A protein has these predicted regions:
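Alpha-helical scaffolding flanking metal-ion-dependent phosphate/phosphodiester catalytic sites
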Residues: 142, 163-176, 192-206, 210-293, ...
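Short alpha-helical linear motifs
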Residues: 129-132, 183-192, 243-247, 299-302, ...
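Residue-level signal for pocket-adjacent positions within structured domains
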Residues: 12, 22, 31, 37, ...
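Short, flexible segments with low predicted structural confidence
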Residues: 18-23, 106, 113-114, 121, ...
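Short hydrophobic/aromatic segments of transmembrane alpha-helices and their interfaces
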Residues: 30, 157, 242-243
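Terminal helices and disordered tails flanking the catalytic cores of nucleotide-processing hydrolases
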Residues: 2-108, 231, 239, 266-404
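Short Gly/charged-rich anion-binding patches and loops
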Residues: 45, 145, 247
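Acidic/His-rich, divalent-metal-binding segments that scaffold phosphate/diphosphate chemistry
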Residues: 61-198, 202-215
Length: 404
């Protein structure tokens, strides 16, 4: 990992944990109960517990490193991810045993309840993945993303169930993929690696046909999984997907790829959300522009307080997020301590955002201390309020034009 882009938080495998290390992230029980809070000092019993939980490793802080800021919603996001992963493991164990997947509807409804009707953007924080837990974490993250996107596109509950179920189960074939391939980045996969992945995904969905009559949403979800897995091999499909399924495939494809590109992985470094959105937008034939734009309405790409790399060669901090065009917020340029409104053509010609600085666990790096130096200033407060009001008017005007 390129250290200059990240803060000091370190990932340590459970085998290498030592008493006295401080946790950078909380550890939850499978039912969501907090076991160890952030900044907790690890003890020998705690290390044994971490190993018994099946954790690949944990994030620890440097000796003098402060605890990174996290909102209540961010903490709940991590808590729910933990709960969902354990519930998904239970579902996949039942599938492996060819037993009825009783917990599946509850898991799906829980995800949709929390993320399928949001009226605001969220911080899509990622967990570091290994070949051992990639399948579970990727499935959960993809299900959360498709739930948010489908909600913005006004899909009904049954359609959301179909999408979320497909997101959770389409990739169970990854369990058949060798570790050395799973640890690779998508841009380093050989042709033979991709063939192995394709064959594994096809093999994974084969046994799911036995659940067609178990749940009313499952036949449609299975058809979506097949349409997605065989998208590049339509000759293998018994029935071509209808228009609705084709639309769902587009949603699943964007969510799937965005998550894989931005997730931290032991084997390869992720790209930033900005880079991921650029890559998706550049391939409009494969990634639907409307879906990509809708994704940007669901999650923060360039949020307030984020540290940013600028085209001028220095860094800046986002003061006011632009909810209409995330690449054109109001920023504080640290090189000259001046405010620039990138929604202004004059300012945008001078400065553009190149990328975002990230933490080791792929969070947006938030420079709260630097912000504190400027926010109390009355002039800056007035300017920031002015820019926020201006951006809000632009946003409202564009929404009105879209509605017409």
């Amino acid at each position: 990992i390129r250290r200059e882009r990240y803060l000091n938080m370190n990932f340590v495998r459970t085998d290498h944990l030592k008493a006295g290390m401080r946790l950078a992230k909380p550890i939850y029980h499978k039912n969501g109960v907090l076991l160890y809070d952030r900044n907790s000092v690890l003890t020998e019993p705690g290390i044994i517990s971490a190993r018994n939980f099946g954790l690949v490793g944990v994030y620890v802080l440097e000796p003098a490193e402060p605890v990174p800021p996290l909102s209540r919603e961010d903490l709940e996001f991590e808590q729910l991810q933990t709960v969902y992963i354990f519930q998904l493991r239970e579902c996949l164990d039942l599938i492996a045993k060819r037993k009825r997947i009783e917990p599946l509807p509850k898991l799906l409804n829980n995800i949709i309840q929390h993320y399928g009707a949001l009226d605001h953007r969220v911080n899509f924080n990622q967990n570091l993945r290994s070949s051992e837990d990639f399948m579970y974490k990727h499935a959960i993250s993809t299900a959360i993303l498709v739930s948010m996107i489908s909600s913005r596109l006004h899909y009904d509950h049954q359609q959301q169930l179909t999408l979320a179920a497909a997101a959770l189960l389409y990739d169970i074939g990854y369990s058949h993929v060798p570790k050395n391939i799973l640890d690779k980045g998508s841009d380093t996969l050989s042709t033979s690696d991709r063939e192995v992945l394709q064959h594994a995904l096809e093999r994974g969905i084969e046994p799911l046909g036995m659940y067609r009559s178990d749940f009313d949403f499952f036949p449609r979800a299975l058809a979506l999984m097949q349409a997605y897995v065989y998208a590049d091999y339509p000759e293998k499909l018994a029935i071509m997907p209808d228009e609705e399924l084709q639309g769902m495939v587009k949603i699943l494809r964007v969510a799937d790829q965005f998550d894989q590109m931005t997730a931290m992985n032991i084997g390869h470094e992720p790209v930033s959300e900005i880079s991921a959105m650029k890559l998706l937008s550049a391939d409009a034939t494969r990634y639907d522009k409307q879906i990509v734009a809708t994704l940007a309405e669901c999650i923060h790409i360039v949020p307030q307080a984020a540290n940013i790399d600028l085209s001028t060669g220095d860094k800046g901090i986002v003061l006011v997020e632009n909810t209409t065009n995330y690449m054109r917020p109001v920023i504080l340029r640290l090189g000259d301590n001046k405010i620039y409104d990138l929604s202004s053509e004059a300012d945008f010609r001078k400065i553009q955002i190149l990328d975002i600085m990230k933490t080791m666990d792929n969070r947006i790096s938030v420079d709260e201390e630097t912000l504190k130096q400027f926010v109390p200033d009355e002039k800056l407060k007035e300017l920031t309020a002015h820019f926020r009001e201006r951006l809000q008017k632009i946003h409202e005007r564009e929404n009105t034009q879209t509605a017409q």
